Amino acid sequence: MGYSIVNILGGLLIVTSTMVVVSKNIKHAIRWYVVQSLVLVGLLATLGATTGAQELLMWAGSAFITKVVLVPYILNRAYKKMGEPSDASLKAGLKPAWAICIIAVEVAICFAVVTQISLPTAEVATPALAISFAHFFVGLTCIISQRNIMKQIFGYCLMENGSHVTLALLAPTAPEIIEIGIATDAIFAVIIMSIVVRRIWDDSHSLDARDLSELRG
């Protein structure tokens, strides 16, 4: 029963990731990222209760602080500091329908790969493990397909969430220090990327990647 819930929550992760990718503006993307992070916290807590790994319960707590609270706060603050720019609703390079199809293919490929892996977790949590692997490609799709450079930050966040779930599934008893390292790395990366985006906005008053091809270091 426990792993069934984990797999269901894994399914919700890919749904929320898709919504982040196809969101039309930054505010909606932030809200969907918060929802995904809450699902991630629930997945970690459920997996911890199922496996008896107390470490995962601690992971769930730290994930709530970093992913549900801190990262959205940093992104929202950066967005407001720029005055909520009008081009925050730039259309993506891919239409939503195409993005959904690409994500579906990525999940299917990862599912096919995971079914060939002979690990205990792969046998009981195949969907969740496949989805965690797929998040790397979903994040990459987000980065490549978005014209809005702030929206591209979410691609990194999705990739990081996927690696988080993969580690939890494959090494549920890993020391808490590993989780702290992952979370700290993610927070500082988001802070740095947000600062860079704000500097670009201050200099060019545009978040459109197509307007930034002439930038020089």
Language-model-detected regions and their locations in the chain:
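Alpha-helical transmembrane segments of multi-pass membrane proteins predominantly involved
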Residues: M1-G217
